[in-house]
Design a protein with these regions (language model features):
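Aromatic-rich, lipid-facing transmembrane alpha helices and their immediate juxtamembrane interface loops
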Residues: 1-250
């Protein structure tokens, strides 16, 4: 019961959640991958999962915002040396596109091409771009904070996991493809998470409930942060995002 009584947060520092330019680049990259997949393979799978996951994740971002589950600061784009604040709903859409459409599209696209060296070079070029984008940033002001073990989120995560395993059981011909997509997403997310943690842009907070039912902030150690971020990578990204495959591909 300690896991339920205590409060665990993922904290984002820096301007990652507020940098609209980078999010737009990721959106464009996802669209280009989908176009290439359609032209060369006559497949709309990437388009389907990109559009579907973006819509759903934008709704999730909106719910996180209005319920104060995630504290979100204003998002900006820089154009012609001007800093322009984006309307909140455009910000939520771009956040939803990156969190949903970008990750699922990249996961599916490169998961299908793990045995092709040319595509792996492109994949790792993307990863290098992401790393450079991380290590060249220095702003460590807190930008968002998300409570990951609310009763609602744990129930949803449990239902999503059951649903995905049910779909895998009923559609065994898709197991290998889903496994490759899972591997691709977890690999990408692990590298991104490591470098954002290393630079101080991503960390965790833990609040323990004492005998008086009051929350006391714990001094977190590396193991605490590792386990919380690992949960985010494996469950909230790897397993949860397979839901979009099952909804829009099968």
């Amino acid at each position: 019961m300690e896991i339920l009584n205590n409060r665990y947060y993922i904290v984002r520092n820096g301007d990652f959640a507020t940098d609209g330019n980078t999010k737009i680049l990721y959106c464009i990259f996802s669209i280009l991958l989908s176009i290439e997949d359609y032209i060369n393979n006559n497949s709309i799978n990437c388009f389907s999962i990109m559009i579907g996951s973006t819509i759903i994740w934008t709704i999730i971002e909106y719910i996180l915002y209005i319920t104060n589950t995630r504290i979100i600061k204003p998002m900006y784009i820089y154009f012609l040396e001007k800093k322009i604040e984006l309307p909140k709903y455009i910000s939520l859409f771009l956040q939803g596109f990156q969190e949903g459409g970008f990750i699922t599209t990249v996961g599916l696209y490169f998961g299908d091409r793990l045995n092709n060296i040319n595509y792996l070079i492109i994949y790792h070029s993307l990863i290098i771009f992401m790393i450079i984008n991380i290590i060249t940033k220095y702003n460590i002001i807190k930008s968002s904070k998300r409570h990951i073990n609310t009763y609602e989120s744990l129930i949803i995560m449990g239902l999503v996991t059951i649903y995905n395993f049910k779909m895998i059981y009923q559609n065994p011909e898709h197991i290998w493809r889903q496994l490759k997509m899972f591997t691709s997403m977890v690999y990408l997310s692990s590298i991104w998470t490591f470098f954002t943690w290393y630079k101080g842009f991503r960390t965790a907070e833990v609040y323990l409930m004492n005998e008086n039912n009051k929350y006391i902030k714990k001094q977190v150690n590396t193991l605490d942060i590792f386990l919380i971020l690992l949960y985010d990578i494996i469950f909230e990204i790897g397993i949860a995002y397979l839901t979009f495959y099952n909804l829009f591909i099968i």
